[in-house]
């Protein structure tokens, strides 16, 4: 890869060698349970010795964690931290700026306890956060749920990659789908991605991505979710803070200040598998009909959605958000 960047994980606990772990979610032949109803089991921490940061203990309702920036009496529409206090987004973001990615996950669990979840698309860089959440579980004894929105239109390579990472890392995967089947959506609305209009793309993203994800958040009681958004992906993302209010929840971005080389350095350092489409020239992968390899004139998220837009509908504060 020709990578001569700094090590983005400097200061992490010593590397834990990976081993294959049994699937944590299974039904029938597949280790992944894809559910349209999103009826999830409660997430319970597993027993482990308390590390120095006391990660295995959720926030004490008797008093705010000294490392958590909260304010009282404001922002009542946003979910509180685990102590009932209101999170001060500006102060917390300033605090998070000084932390590396694993420490940001530690902070989020100390702040939100069982209200923390992670989202994944099983895309080009997804192995990084999935490996971090596995290592978080190993050092803290806490299994953070990983939510995957299966649109029904992902490339075959993505489905196989999801199986590979799940079997390798053994994270607590919660796969969710839209309540409307792909066939019914196409019968009622047509093949929305073929019309060439932003309105149809936004309807598609709302039906296949945003609504299933928000339903999963409600069913799991999520107050904060971590995602793999990086500032270098788009101009808009470059202006994002590490912590932001998004559709009534807190959005945490552990990898916000990582470069593309940082991502591939981490994958190489930890011996993680690459998405199969990476070798075919893809720098980002979503649904099969809105993803394309870099062609020398466009790259990154400029290759998505036929060039009409860069984002799918997840990470912005409004109804429609910015991509997974």
Where are these regions (language model features)?
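Low-complexity, intrinsically disordered Ser/Thr/Pro- and acidic-rich segments
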Residues: 1-3, 74
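Intrinsic low-complexity, disordered N-terminal segments enriched in polar/charged/small residues
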Residues: 5-7, 15-16, 30
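Nucleotide-activated chemistry modules centered on ATP-dependent adenylation/adenylyltransferase
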Residues: 22-25, 29, 34-61, 65-324
């Amino acid at each position: 890869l020709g990578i001569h960047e700094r090590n983005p994980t400097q200061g992490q606990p010593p590397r834990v060698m990976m081993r294959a772990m049994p699937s944590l979610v299974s039904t029938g032949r597949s280790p992944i349970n894809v559910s349209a109803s999103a009826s999830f089991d409660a997430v319970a921490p597993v027993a482990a010795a308390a590390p120095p940061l006391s990660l295995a203990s959720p926030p004490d309702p008797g008093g705010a964690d000294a490392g958590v920036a909260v304010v009282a009496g404001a922002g009542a529409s946003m979910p509180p931290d685990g102590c009932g206090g209101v999170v001060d987004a500006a102060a917390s973001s300033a605090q998070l700026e000084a932390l590396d990615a694993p420490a940001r996950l530690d902070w989020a669990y100390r702040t939100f306890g069982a209200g923390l979840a992670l989202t994944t698309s099983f895309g080009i860089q997804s192995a990084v956060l999935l490996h971090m959440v596995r290592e978080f579980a190993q050092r803290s004894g806490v299994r953070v749920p990983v939510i995957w929105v299966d649109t029904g239109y992902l490339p075959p390579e993505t489905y196989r990659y999801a199986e590979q990472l799940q079997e390798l890392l053994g994270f607590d995967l919660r796969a969710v789908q839209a309540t409307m089947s792909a066939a019914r959506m196409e019968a009622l609305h047509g093949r929305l991605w073929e019309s060439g209009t932003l309105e149809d793309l936004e309807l598609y993203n709302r039906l296949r991505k945003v609504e299933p994800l928000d339903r999963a958040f409600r069913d799991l009681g999520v107050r904060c979710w971590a995602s793999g958004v990086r500032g270098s992906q788009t101009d808009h993302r470059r202006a994002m803070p590490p912590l932001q209010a998004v559709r009534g929840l807190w959005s945490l971005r552990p990898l916000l200040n990582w470069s593309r080389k940082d991502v591939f350095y981490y994958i190489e350092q930890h011996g993680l598998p690459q998405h199969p489409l990476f070798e075919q020239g893809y720098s980002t992968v979503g649904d099969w009909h809105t993803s394309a390899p870099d062609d020398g004139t466009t790259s990154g998220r400029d290759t998505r959605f036929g060039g009409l837009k860069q984002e799918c509908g997840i990470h912005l504060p409004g109804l429609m958000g910015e991509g997974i």
